[in-house]
Amino acid sequence: MATSMAQTIYVCKDGDYTTREIAEGLELSLTEGIDSITFRQPVMEKAVKITFQEDKASVVIPSFIEGVTCSSGTSSDVVLTSTNLTDEIIYRVSGSSRAGSLTINGDYKLTVALDGVSLTSAKGAPLNIQCGKRIAVVMADGSVNNFTDAAGGTNKACVYTKGHFEFSGAGTLNVTGNANHAIASKEYCQIKRSVKAVNILKAANDAIHCGQYFQMNGGEVNITSTTTNDAIQAEYELDDNDAIIQDPENTGGIVIKGGSVNILLANAEDAKGLKAEGNIDITGGTFIIDAVSNGTRGMQTDANMTISEADAPTTITVNAKGTKCTVAEDAADPHNCMGIKVDGNLTVNAGTVTVYNTGKKAKGIKVGGTYTLNGGTVNAVVDSAQ
């Protein structure tokens, strides 16, 4: 007998099973001593392929994928809608367009696989995921992926989802947010250990903005001086009545377990490098934050901060070079530049924290609650209430 396609077969001999890959068209014969041969159909990857070619894009939806349709306002603005609620579909994206975008609508978790894509949108977000579930963004090893939106747009971010982002893969993501945030998610945002780099080249608002929490397990995040508000901001997710949603994941916090974070706040008066409504928990990583603009703060939390080396060595360096904030909205609170501000308690268990407050009247560390040094080294003047 001949196989009609490449398959995996199970061969049973004397009660023991082994597997073999059989190429298409290969003749098989049942020889003496073989009890049976069982064919297993190959697993077909449920992937939609989107390839951008400047003013056009090709979309391939395999016939065995159910519930996915494509519509486009223009040939390079791709809109995909999925009604499939049982299968996690992969959207493989490559190519480039100087006037293109990808919008995905759906109600089930999905994966966006980036392999050297470069999109600039003249209308809104070049990557817009209208799905309130888990959105895995996987970058191919060694790939460089670029997204840029247009100034004056009404989109919430250059790279946006109404669900939660999980970035992974040993590639690079470059985001230029000319309209609003660079990256934003309504729910949490995670950067996995495998990520090579996330580079925010510009943000008209926050560089990375998320609800629920922000978590970084490794990789590298670089945020440049063209960000005009906070670098990384996590806030509580709210319901339609602006009340905090009661959910264990809705912590409003920042958790960083490793990797490197490099932030330059040189064009963002009153901005913060890390800003959390909830707790900031650092258990590993290397941080270099240059707070150059007036009134800037390297790190700020409305709650508590804990620093340790539970997951990796921790080194935090904040250069507080700015002076007093002068923007009109802060006239009632003309605060100075500061390295770290903790409204609650600050606990340092391990690691090295250094604040260089070289700006005029710049401050080191201010703690509204209790400051506890259990281990590690803190090279800064700490002003605590207790």
For each of these PLM feature ranges, what is it?
Residues 23-37:
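Structured surface patches comprising rigid loops and adjacent beta-strands/short helices at the edges
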Residues 1-8:
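Bacterial Sec-dependent N-terminal signal peptides
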